[in-house]
A protein has these predicted regions:
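Extended, regular secondary-structure scaffolds
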Residues: 220-222, 226, 232, 241-262, ...
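Non-catalytic terminal extensions that flank enzyme cores
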Residues: 2-56
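Non-catalytic, conformational "gating/processing" segments within enzyme and secreted inhibitor domains
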Residues: 219-251, 734-769
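His/Glu-based metal-binding/catalytic segments typifying zinc-dependent metallopeptidases
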Residues: 46-60, 171-183, 261-327, 412-431, ...
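M16 family metallopeptidases and their MPP-like homologs
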Residues: 54-64, 90-138, 145-156, 183-208, ...
Length: 864
């Protein structure tokens, strides 16, 4: 529908229950926007009306923390554990079982808590909206203290003679969070920069402080802060706007009065410092982890406010030029001086005063001065002599392309617009739209690039700005044991202070909580959860557009879809000629291609050209199981690009250059890449250990999982760790094997193409693809023989984490079962009945999941 028509329709609304603050046509996201305030309750409401069938609702609250107990986080969990209309213990889980939602979750931020849902099905959208609205305003936390104990924390004592323990979902979740040095560093950074504001507190909760939260304070917080007068309600998509606004008023908002509460939710501005603050903190490592070259150094600056529309985007582009882009000047200067092996940055813009951080990982504490001196030396040079304008243009195009494309993977774009809007709306209730009206800002930034804008920003916010900190996060052996001992001693001291009667009361409370958790919700409560009828569901499945074509004797799978003149191209090369011993190099290629010099461009130049002229080129390895014979699988190497139709010749030219002309013999660059891969994999394993455990377990019996493990799992990490450790003795072999692997992969015989665009896009692909194929190598080489040998080993990997990640895997086909649609149902039963009840609810772990693949592989996983 035309935007004018959508906007005109909004003019016909009866808004008698609401005050219209503003109405805007937001062409950048093809939406007509309304900013409203509910007259009686004071609720703030934004409507983005458009033709997107993936409808989004969210209600959020401004929830700045005032201590480290994690009250806000525990409240987020607890509100979804039953309510007035839906008293079932876990309405969230029941919705997961029977909803067609495209998103269903809740999130706690440093200063807000949001409850977003999304669905393409209108009946489903209305159902889940109502469950969430009832949950936040009428939760069962007042009637069931067990909810607070289960989701937050409780004392656990099975008998008088047993050791006293803490347990609770949030308590265990945050132990997992604080096992990651990256998360510890982020926390230390905020404490250092905001000593006088709410941001010095951990809204998620620090494990040592979570048990300080009382049930009474918990209830008082909800009564005051979870009121419509403190709420931010969002409606997005294609629906009857009048019906939704009337629903909000009639079912909920009219029952509240803004005058009933006095909420001072304003977040204070931190007074700037006179000088840069320096602090040293510690993180835990195991006895066999090194102390040398294992320190994090973080240079942090507070940059303006989130309400500065131009600065909001300009800092993203400046970050791209300084650190994010391959070969970025500041990053390269630190690496060249040996200050860390992995340089990364973060821009936290979802707070009132955004924070920009530059981090050197795998550094030494003694390098603090050199770290700061190098950063400021590079910044002064850029401020004086000018920014790399071509790299800045590449950064602008990169972010503008992402904004226009609005492809956020598993996250609906309407959800991402809401989170972006909250970056301004939370701090100025009259300005929700400024950050989703971005195209004029991009145009302004392009204009001001030649006028010294970015040089001025560097001078003002990074060089002349003393509101900053330098954090050294230093490894410490035995720290985890110290924390565990402190917790055990605290519990033992408390236990020894109790009388026999008090101990018996805790034992009884423990048993009562477990009994509550064991008891299923009554059938009459379960039946109150709104479920879709068959009549609510489209009988016809979504159409798959798959049309097999041929260009220059190469198979092309065409997906004829509307893409707004953007072509999505994937070159998929079969790796059947790559022997087992070279398969780790297939994984390594995905981190090397496009990030090393070619015979035509340096790698920074290459990245600039790609990002200025396209939406990016990426490469990766993948494994596909045969859809008819599940014992067969194929290792593929995929080269992907997205461009406007007229740029198809360019993207194919760049792909050819990357796969054939990369200079693998550049030892210095190869060493940098391998060190960075090792660093990133170690960080990912700390935070996502369940994926490592799952793949390692399935690799014991599943050929496809075994080879996936070689390409991206723990076996790949072992390969990378050895390459990093023994680089000097392996460097020639590494370069030679990369060349050999690329030669075995990138041939015409191995190529299949996937192309997503309309027919006119396919027509424009014909000529450049024919030319590309003509330049492909031919290779007469026998197919490699795969030598998978199943083993049955129970494996454990140790780390300094306070929590465990556990996976149990098997293959149901080997047990005599076939794949049917019933396994989709069984997955829901396993995940949301058996595992949820036993692992999360009763065990206190943060997460659990299960799955069944068509080839028979199955898994059950718990984490944190």
């Amino acid at each position: 529908m035309d935007l004018k028509e959508i906007s005109t329709a909004l003019d016909q609304l009866d808004l008698s229950k609401y005050e219209l603050i503003k109405k805007e046509e937001i062409a950048d996201i093809h939406s007509a926007g309304l900013l409203l305030k509910h007259k009686k309750s004071g609720a703030r409401v934004v409507v983005l009306s458009n033709d997107d069938e993936n409808k989004v609702f969210s209600i959020g609250f401004k929830t700045p923390p005032f201590n480290d107990t994690g009250l806000q986080h525990i409240m987020e969990h607890s509100t979804l554990c039953g309510s007035r209309k839906y008293p079932v213990k876990d309405p969230f889980v029941e919705l997961c079982k029977g909803s067609l939602n495209t998103f269903l979750n809740a999130m706690t931020y440093p200063d807000k808590t949001v409850y977003p849902v999304a669905s393409c099905n209108l009946a489903d959208f209305k159902n889940i909206t109502d469950v969430y609205m009832d949950a936040v305003f009428y939760p069962n936390i007042y009637q069931r203290e067990q909810i607070f104990k289960q989701e937050g924390w409780h004392y656990e004592l099975d008998s008088i003679d047993s050791p006293l323990k803490y347990n609770g979902v949030v308590f265990n979740e945050m132990k997992g969070v604080y096992s990651s040095p990256d998360d510890v560093l982020s926390r230390d950074t905020f404490v250092s920069l905001f000593p006088d504001t709410a941001y010095r507190f951990e809204s998620g909760g620090e494990p040592s402080h979570i048990p300080e939260l009382s049930y009474e304070d918990f209830l008082a917080y909800h009564k005051k802060w979870y009121h419509p007068a403190n709420s931010y309600i969002y409606l997005y998509g294609d629906f009857d706007v009048q019906e939704r606004l009337d629903y909000l008023d009639n079912e909920y908002l009219k029952n509240f009065d803004a005058n009933d509460v006095q909420i001072d939710a304003d977040i204070a501005m931190q007074r700037p410092f006179d000088i840069l603050k320096e602090e040293t903190h510690y993180y835990a490592v195991t006895e066999d982890e090194p102390l040398e070259n294992n320190t994090y150094l973080s240079y942090n600056k507070v940059v303006g406010t989130a309400l500065d529309k131009k600065l909001y985007l300009a800092m993203q582009i400046l970050d791209y030029v300084l650190v994010m882009a391959p070969g970025a000047k500041l990053k390269q200067a630190l690496i060249d001086k040996g200050i860390g092996t992995d340089i990364y940055s973060s821009l936290e813009s979802s707070v009132l005063q955004p924070v920009y951080s530059i981090v050197a990982k795998n550094a030494e504490e003694s390098q603090k001065k050199a770290f700061v001196d190098t950063i400021e030396e590079v910044l002064r040079d850029i401020a004086k002599n000018g920014i790399d304008k071509r790299m800045a243009l590449a950064g602008m195009n990169y972010y503008e392309f992402k904004f226009r494309e609005a492809d956020y993977g598993a996250y609906p774009k309407g959800l991402m617009y809401y989170l972006t809007m909250m970056d301004s709306w939370l701090y100025d209730e009259n300005e929700p739209f400024i950050h989703v009206q971005a195209l004029d800002t991009f145009a302004q930034l392009r204009k001001e690039l030649d006028e010294g804008l970015f040089e001025e920003l560097i001078q003002k916010y990074l060089l002349d700005n003393s509101h900053g900190s330098l954090i050294a996060l230093v490894p410490k052996r035995g720290l985890e044991e110290e924390k565990a001992a402190e917790e055990a001693k605290r519990l033992e001291t408390y236990k020894n202070s109790l009388s026999k009667e008090e101990l018996e009361a805790i034992v009884a409370d423990t048993a009562a909580l477990k009994a509550y958790q064991d008891e299923p919700s009554p059938q009459e409560e379960l039946e109150r959860i709104p479920m879709l009828k068959l009549s609510d569901i489209e009988r016809e499945p979504a159409k798959l557009y798959i049309d097999k074509k041929s260009i220059a004797d190469v198979d092309v799978i065409h997906h004829n879809l509307f893409t707004n003149q953007i072509a999505y191209l994937m070159l998929a090369f079969d790796c059947k000629k790559v022997p087992d011993e070279l398969l780790p190099y297939v994984g390594l290629l995905s981190s090397v291609l496009g990030l090393m010099d070619t015979h035509k461009h340096t790698y920074p130049e290459l990245t600039n050209e790609i990002n200025i002229n396209s939406g990016g080129i990426s490469t990766d390895a993948a494994i596909y199981t045969d859809s008819k014979d599940f014992s067969k699988y194929t290792v593929m190497y995929e080269v992907k690009g997205k461009v406007l139709y007229e740029k198809l010749p360019f993207v194919l030219e760049m792909m050819h250059e990357i796969i054939y002309e990369t200079k693998f013999e550049d030892e210095k660059r190869l060493r940098e890449i391998i060190a960075r891969i090792k660093s990133r994999m170690e960080s990912n394993m700390t935070g996502s250990g369940h994926t490592v455990a799952m793949l390692s377990a399935m690799a014991q019996f599943s050929p496809s999982s075994y080879y996936s493990d070689i390409l991206r799992g723990y076996q790949y990490y072992e390969f990378i760790e050895k390459a990093d450790r023994d680089f000097d003795s392996m460097k020639e072999m590494l370069a030679e094997n990369l060349k050999r692997t690329a030669a075995l992969i990138f041939t015409k015989e191995n190529l299949t193409v996937s192309f997503t665009a309309e027919d006119d896009g396919l027509e424009l692909l014909q000529k450049p693809m024919t030319e590309f194929v003509a330049k492909l190598a031919r290779l007469q080489e026998k197919d490699a023989v795969r030598t998978f040998r199943p083993v049955k080993e129970k494996t454990a990997y140790t780390s300094s984490s306070q929590v465990q990640y556990v996976a149990r895997c098997g293959n149901y086909r080997k047990a005599g079962y076939e794949y049917t649609g019933a396994l989709k149902v069984l997955k829901i039963i396993f995940s949301y009945d058996y595992l949820w009840l036993n692992v999360r609810v009763k065990g206190g772990a943060y997460g659990c999941m299960s799955g069944f693949y068509r080839n028979g592989d199955t898994y059950m996983v718990s984490y944190r």
